[in-house]
């Protein structure tokens, strides 16, 4: 069987939050590979860590949260080099990745998508912003 490099790989990811001096272990040792073109749904009960885990891919954890163990790697960068997302700390580094390389639509579409615009218009708007394209080229 042929093996390919995933576009996104998480290995033994642990995420903790500091809550008034106490440590909350929100995620304990998750492994995940997503292949190019693959669609993945992460499901679970409310409070099970779905949003925390996926926010960690984008550097969107709350200020009191951190990846304390493990790695998250992105292998789809335009220049072919892997990006170790779990090591990015500065907002300026995330700005090079977020929207340009990876993006996400949060689970509540009413707060993520504008009901007055088509989805195509909203995707084109993101492309215009990040890729500096206009009109049809963005669509």
What is each model feature region?
Residues 1-139:
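ABC transporter nucleotide-binding domains
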